[in-house]
Amino acid sequence: VTDEAGAGVVRVAVDAPQHSGLTGPLDYASEQALAPGSLVRVPLGKRELLGIVWPGGANALPEVALRPVTAVFDVLAPLGAEWCRLLDFAASYYQRSVGELASAVLPPQLRELSPEQLAARLRKLEKKPAKAAAPAPVKPALAPEQAAAVERITAQIAGGAPKPLLLFGVTGSGKTEVYLRAAEAALAAGRQVLVLVPEINLTPQLEARFTERFAALLPGPLAIVSLHSALTPAQRLQNWLAAHLGTA
């Protein structure tokens, strides 16, 4: 809800547990128009919290005085509509508030930084040197079954509306090479690739495999990153920023 100057009322999801009674986004006054998914800092009681401008119309009554948004993280692009829809689904499924779940999935250090401090972190990331040029990898020849799987996956990627596919194969049957070829097709189409690993112990091995394959294609310092519980808070923020900004 905005006026002609762009100011108005925004809904903001904040980290408030379900049992607190604050089960949904709260209304705040904003001096500028803010897109859904924008990260902000807002007051709640005596605290100041990280919040996310949430999709949907505000509910404030005209005679109610609203507290203002304190700061806007305008150095970051808003979180996407699909991300917000996923959080809405998860909040409903797990019976938690959207702000509580958002706080759990965003990097912990993000909750502690001001927009100015975050901007300084981003400038530091931009100064990271690029990796040395790597030779193009030698790809193994595909077995007929692998080639058929790669063809079907890449056709869906090219079509623009991929559907879930189940790749079946026993251990050692060559599934990882199919994943690598599918990732290569997605990267060639200008997209990002998210790989879910079943257990943390497999992360270094799989990350090394992807780095070896794509080092020549992705020479950036943070082109391939991982997110898991063994990372330090600073590493987690750095890697999340790389993914969110599209450099990873």
State each model region's role.
Residues V1-A248:
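Accessory, non-ATPase domains that flank or precede helicase/AAA+ motor cores in DNA-metabolism machines
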